[in-house]
């Protein structure tokens, strides 16, 4: 394989970046709605939404993994701003999903304590 064949184009990298932003953005929206549902006491809906967020973030992660695999295989990568934005969105949304799961449990515990009174 020549050097050109071992190089992902800027367009390919940007397309992955756009996919990361799209999937992670959908995941972020679902996670925020899950928090809203938990705060309202609708824990079934909250859990459903956090699982949707997880599915969306898994799709984003799959996109990222494909690009990482190419780079690990020797392909050269030019970093694009949209890819940096995509990575940032992916990582912050992964953290948000983890925190959302924790907050759902907190809201549930608060509701249980309120019901004891």
Features from the language model and the residues they span:
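Terminal alpha-helical segments
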Residues: 2-117
């Amino acid at each position: 394989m020549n050097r050109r064949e071992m190089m992902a184009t800027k367009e390919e990298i940007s397309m992955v970046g756009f996919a990361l932003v799209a999937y992670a953005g959908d995941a972020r929206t679902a996670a925020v709605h899950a928090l809203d549902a938990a705060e309202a006491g609708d824990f079934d809906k909250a859990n459903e939404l956090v699982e949707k967020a997880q599915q969306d973030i898994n799709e984003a992660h799959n996109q990222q993994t494909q690009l990482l695999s190419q780079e690990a295989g020797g392909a050269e990568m030019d970093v694009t701003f949209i890819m940096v934005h995509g990575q940032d969105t992916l990582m912050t949304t992964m953290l948000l999903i983890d925190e959302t799961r924790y907050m759902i449990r907190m809201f549930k515990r608060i509701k249980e304590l309120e019901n004891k009174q």
